[in-house]
Amino acid sequence: FFVDKFQIPLAKSYGADAILIILAGVSDKLANELYEEALRLDMSVIVEVHTVDEAKQALKFKDALIGINNRNLKTLKTDINTTFDIHDVLVSHTGPLISESGIKTKDELLELSNKTSIKTFLIGESLLKDLENNSIFSVL
């Protein structure tokens, strides 16, 4: 993730083609600057949200992918209901939506896919913990 717009050209020079803006970690002004700089350099932008208020703020980033992170940044606990709570705010966004973190089972993945317009998921911890069973892999 980025905290200064001067990081973006450097990342681009190292081959990056996208940046992550975590709205909980930057001011509104800086989020705008990061977004504009990335677009200027023909890079994709993922805007990450954790709350309904951040989701409302993210709607102005029309060319971004928006990720709903199910991890509470204060407690580090995950809850996929975060995606359900925030999704309705983002239905007008024309770009891709991503549900991030906390997806532990095939049933949770299917529930998110069936009850929202989201078809893109970031799954990390569950995949690493399930390397032997591979049960979640069969859904992907």
Predicted segments with their positions:
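Catalytic beta/alpha-barrel core
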Residues: 1-4, 17-28, 42-55, 67-77, ...
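Glycine/Thr-rich beta-alpha phosphate-binding loop at enzyme active sites
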Residues: 59-87
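Anion (oxyanion) recognition and catalysis
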Residues: 39, 91
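Catalytic cores of alpha/beta
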Residues: 3-15, 50-62, 93-123, 135-139
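Aromatic/hydrophobic pocket-lining residues that form π-stacking "cages" and hydrophobic walls in ligand
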Residues: 34, 38, 86
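C-terminal helical cap(s) of enzyme catalytic domains, especially alpha/beta-barrels
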Residues: 80-90, 127-140
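Glycine-rich phosphate-binding active-site loops on the catalytic face of alpha/beta enzymes
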Residues: 8-29, 67-76, 116-137
